Amino acid sequence: MSFILVNPPLFWKLGDSRFSYLDVCRKIGDDPTGLRSLPAEHLGLSSIQAYCAKKGIPVQVVNGIVAEHTSVEPTFAEIEAIVREHGAPTLIGFSGTSHVFQATLRLARMCLERWPNAHTVMGYDFGTLNFEQLLRDYPDIHFVCRGDGEAVFATLAERLANGRGYDDIPGLAYRGSDGRLHANEPAALEIDTLPWPTRNELPQVLRGGFAAGVYASRGCPYRCSYCTLGQTSALFGNKSYRLRSIENVVEEMAYLKKEFGVRHITIVDDLFLTKAPSSQERARDFAEQLLRRDLGLEWMIDARVDSIDRDLFTLLRRAGLRKVFVGVETGSEEQLASYNKRYGLHEETQSDRLKVLRDLQIVIVPGMLMFHPNVTTTEVRQSLQLIDEMGSESHYQMYNRIQLYPGTPLYREYEEKGWAIGEWPVKDWEFRDPRAKGLSDAVLWASIQSGATFQDVRKVFVQHLEAWENNLDITEHSPPSIFDSAALQRSGAA
């Protein structure tokens, strides 16, 4: 009998060549220090594995992304190897975003063909927000975990192994014997009581040049329309944003340094710091504890621009903060409002906050959503100005576009407006103005050319933007569309 957790592979096909997700990260990593702060472990599956181990349930993990698989076959081969050693699977859990759903589906079918008595369960935000469609339309998915996965997976594994019922497990969605769908309300775990995630993948991750990750919280108090985390967090009501104690977080960081020689750690929270006084004080406590422990670690966080305070960040810098991901998204206040993301800052105030980071020599990793269907030259100019103010020389920020994730308000909005194209769950959109598409394609094309610098890409960006502003037709001089070309495919199934 075995219990298996699977992170399906994500890869791209270009002609006859295939590139793993991590290989693509290396190829587009125009910031030479970027990979060092990119966490590659799947802490969610590692946390479930640790929780189950504490309950006496041995769980094996197959991570197709860390293993850099470029098809589902090697992932399935790893599952087969586990079964040969530990016995036929009772429960197989799948994680991942909508972009690996086809890989998940194919792996589930392969597993059930080989071991027809096995059960399958899906999780992650994608499963949480789309459980009805998954259970209604995909018979190879038997269960869906909504919310925290540790207790759901452990309890379900135990019940199935002992032949007991599972209809009362909090957070479990399933098909009843009559075919009707049932969804139990999720329960928010006290995350400070959870065991630390297992670190079986970390040596391989570090050898690949990627970062160790630590989570200090779960959830998010905000509800941006494009983000799955905010929608998942809403299920927990007043427990939508849960914090670990700073002592627990710092102790785990010290453990990673001692046991694995880690020098850089990325705090993987979607939001480590807000403008709330309690959050600011917690960050101060974090810095002071790191300084007292004298761990000598460098680290990275995600923070909202309205949380940046000079005194606080001066202290954080002393304690090892070297990078901050700031989700500024766009230079347009109107577009931010359409995403339900409001800072309430004047333009000059936002610039002042970003200048604090630059003055302290803290690297800004910008979260830019440069393009959407109705983008205008005015907004693009505003966003370009914001990029210049941040001082980041990453190509990615100049061609990144809004992504549609099923279960979010933005996904529903684009469907209602007829903008979403393609098959569920991975849908795309088209530009309303072909000149915007020309700009987007030209910048992406320039960025993937060998040896292209940030200034090279920025020059192409400005040239095409000025042509658009002056109402010149640049589309016929644009390179082939990367997004529409059949030559470049993001895949998780083939």
Task: Label every model-predicted segment.
Residues 132-137, 312, 374-388:
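Catalytic cores of alpha/beta
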Residues 40, 192-364, 385:
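Radical SAM [4Fe-4S] cluster-binding motif and immediate context
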Residues 2-3, 9-10, 14-19, 24, ...:
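N-terminal [4Fe-4S]-dependent radical SAM core
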